[in-house]
């Protein structure tokens, strides 16, 4: 998940403040672990599932924010690509019929996703790698979810790398971008 940001331009002082906050929060978390502040007696099981959105031809449907809004459920969130969304399932105590409860929850949430996608002209699919994604679907313009946090993440990764990212995926087919 993550939170949307409003700011789109950052100075060195912003990066310095971010680093300081990250270090302070990490230290705070270490302290909580050292104090055994977390309830270790009740184990919980949580899950998430990433989904792909396809059009009637099986190509990526780039309307994740529309589908998420149509669910009306905060357990659905966006992913980097406009043709992906994520279910963040409910947590359950790790006891008894926990797997049956997770399955029921997942079926219910998946059904919500299917109905919302259908209302938005898309279909929901579960793929590890979307089989019809090609190089044309990997350009930020047009296929990256239009949230500032994704745009800034992309900009920072490219800036840190100092050169374009090259992908070479080889399996039954080869994709080179």
Give the location of each predicted region.
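Phosphate/nucleotide-binding catalytic core
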Residues: 1-177
């Amino acid at each position: 998940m993550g939170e949307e940001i409003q700011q789109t331009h950052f100075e060195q002082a912003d990066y310095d403040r971010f680093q300081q906050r990250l270090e302070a929060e990490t230290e705070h978390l270490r302290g909580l672990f050292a104090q055994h502040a977390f309830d270790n007696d009740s184990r919980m099981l949580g899950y998430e599932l990433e989904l792909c959105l396809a059009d009637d031809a099986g190509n990526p449907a780039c309307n994740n924010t529309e589908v998420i809004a149509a669910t009306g459920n905060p357990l659905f969130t966006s992913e980097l690509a406009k043709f992906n969304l994520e279910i963040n399932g409910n947590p359950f105590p790790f006891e008894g019929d926990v797997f049956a409860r997770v399955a029921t929850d997942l079926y219910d949430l998946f059904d919500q996703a299917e109905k919302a996608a259908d209302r938005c002209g898309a279909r929901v699919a579960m793929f590890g790698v979307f089989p019809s994604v090609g190089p044309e679907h990997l350009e930020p313009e047009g296929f990256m979810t239009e949230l500032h946090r994704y745009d800034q993440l992309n900009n920072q990764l490219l800036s840190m790398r100092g050169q374009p990212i090259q992908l070479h995926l080889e399996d039954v087919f080869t994709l080179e971008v």
